[in-house]
Amino acid sequence: ASSFIMNWDILRNVNMPDVRNAVRTIVFTHDVDLRDGFPDYFYDASYIVVCDPVQYHLRPETQRTIGILADAILSGEDCDNLELIKTYELDEGVTAKVYYRTGEYSAAFKQKIAEQFHDAYPDVPALHPAAE
């Protein structure tokens, strides 16, 4: 998620002002495609937070690193390795869903993600995740 309702910095500072950086192991999301590239660590994350509907702070076509991954998880296709463990109702009808990764992502899931990024950015290798 990358909006004023939910983003990585909101999660990181969830207990402010009492505790700053409450979640020390959270990694920042790659919000802007051409600036940040593909988040290679995505496939190793133990927990994933996805908002429904997907949250953007810019045009969705400039934030495919948010949209493609979130849509793939929300669809549930080829990602049997994710277990929905908690949901939170946020402002403006947004639901934050917390998933726990129970195993590796399937080759089909990785291939689907790789193809979508390659189609969107054929000339930008930094946005071509490995399909494995």
PLM region spans:
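C-terminal luminal/periplasmic domains and tails of membrane-associated envelope-modifying transferases
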Residues: 1-4, 8-132
